Regions:
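Structured helix-beta-strand junction loops
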Residues: 5, 33-35, 82-83, 100-101, ...
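Secondary-structure junction motif
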Residues: 28, 36-58, 128-129
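Short beta-strand->loop
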Residues: 1-8, 65, 99-113
Length: 144
């Protein structure tokens, strides 16, 4: 395992969600079923993780008001920041918008919203220098 990521719910910075964030009291299920939801396309890793998360908390996608399925993480961040809905995304993918206060981040239950990334290779093969360099680069970029 070289990196552990987790999913978070992102929402626009507006009075409704700011109050939710300030009080800390909100029902994730209600928010996801009442607000428009912008999801990644179904074939993406994040899309699969979000679907698995929803299934684990007992929400089927047909109960959501899915406003769009988008294949671009930047587009999702911009749509949510523009007030067009909420989304479930990788925490790493949105830290820039969170830091810039363009989005609000809501934590999801960690034990079911996490995912792990591995570098897999055959242990009996001698890796080329450029492959070893790439692995070191990944480990450096995703240092926890």
């Amino acid at each position: 395992k070289f990196y552990q990521d987790r999913l978070v719910m992102i929402a626009p910075v507006n009075d409704y969600f700011l109050e939710m964030k300030d009080t800390g009291s909100f029902s994730l299920e209600e928010v996801l079923q009442e607000q428009p939801v912008i999801l990644r396309e179904q074939g993406s890793g994040t899309g699969k993780s979000a679907s698995a998360f929803l299934e684990k908390i007992g929400i089927s996608e047909d109960k959501l008001h899915i406003a769009a399925r988008i294949n671009d993480q930047e587009a999702i961040k911009n749509l949510v920041a523009g007030g067009l809905g909420v989304s479930i995304v990788s925490e790493k993918a949105v830290h820039d918008y969170i830091d810039a206060k363009r989005l609000l981040q809501f934590e999801l239950p960690g034990h079911i919203a996490g995912r792990e990334f591995y570098i897999i290779y055959h242990k009996e093969y001698i890796l080329k220098d450029y492959v070893c360099e790439f692995i070191r680069y990944l480990e450096h970029c995703y240092k926890q």
